[in-house]
Amino acid sequence: MKIQRFSLWVLLCVVFSLTGCGYNTMQQAEERVFKAWGDVEATLQRRADLIPNLVETVKGYASHERETLEAVINARAKATSVKLTADDLSDPAALERLQQAQGQISSSLSRLLVVAEQYPDLKANENFRDLQNQLEGTENRINVARQRFNQAAEEFNSMIRSFPNSVTNSMLLHLKRKEYIKADEAAKAVPKVKF
């Protein structure tokens, strides 16, 4: 009887010590994912904030390029209307919606910059060059923020799936795997170069 009681006591101690393994670490890892996502959102917002100034500058020189300008404005409006919560980071469809909206911004900005190439006075405008440089820098920041988010998500996902953290997670936390930011379909296509 004493041996059974002792064995039960030892078993309970082992179970409770295992479930405590990684409890705080997993929560800290999830917070790193949320912080990394906040950085992605901040850089996307920076790009969205640059667009009105860029459009206004181009409009002064290329007012008859109305269709291109409206495409940029509409893409910006759509992208800023797509909001993700912390729970959405585990939802592949929600992340896909955001990525599609951001892809439309990138595409319309590319068309706008192609239009700008047709106007030498616009290209020579110091304000336009400054905005273009800021936009390029922001695109680089977006890429870095996405990479950092994916790294934080990978560390978190690995942590919640490995033993004994998986036991702790399934018994106490019920944290869900975070999705990765993936390249959009257009970026996956290999460009054809013809001379």
Feature roles, as predicted:
Residues K2-F195:
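A helix-centric hydrophobic-segment signal that preferentially recognizes long
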